[in-house]
């Protein structure tokens, strides 16, 4: 599988964790920006060239706000990415989405920079 340098993937547990650092969301938002769509388009190309792989799309948030709202927001982030890929032509059977809310931060939520990193979507290839 040929992968962009910015993309580290876990494929059948042979690679390390997967994250797209540039796929970060504004606070309290699950709207895809133009820059987010460009990153997702890279995933689309990978899926187009490698029809044997599937993707788990994981949504995450920072810890600002209520836990339940953050959980729903993270689910909506993952679903927005999934729906975008489906609109591009990826079969829904190759995509799963899940939201974790604030349960799996990449960085401690101690400042705005760390919190921005935690408002993200990760892609797991399986």
Model-found features: residue ranges?
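Periplasmic OmpA-like peptidoglycan-binding domain that tethers envelope proteins to the cell wall
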Residues: 30-38, 50, 56-126
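Periplasmic peptidoglycan-binding/tethering modules of Gram-negative envelope proteins
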Residues: 1-54
């Amino acid at each position: 599988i040929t992968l962009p340098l910015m993309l580290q993937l876990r494929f059948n547990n042979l690679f390390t964790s997967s994250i797209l650092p540039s796929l970060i969301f504004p606070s309290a938002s699950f709207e895809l920006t133009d820059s987010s769509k460009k990153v997702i388009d890279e995933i689309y190309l990978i899926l187009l060239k490698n029809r044997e792989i599937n993707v788990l799309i994981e949504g995450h948030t920072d810890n600002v706000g209520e836990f339940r709202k953050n959980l729903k927001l993270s689910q909506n982030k993952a679903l927005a990415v999934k729906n975008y890929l489906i609109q591009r032509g990826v079969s829904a059977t190759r995509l799963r989405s899940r939201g974790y809310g604030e349960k799996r931060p990449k960085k401690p939520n101690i400042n705005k920079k760390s919190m921005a990193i935690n408002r993200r979507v990760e892609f797991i290839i399986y």
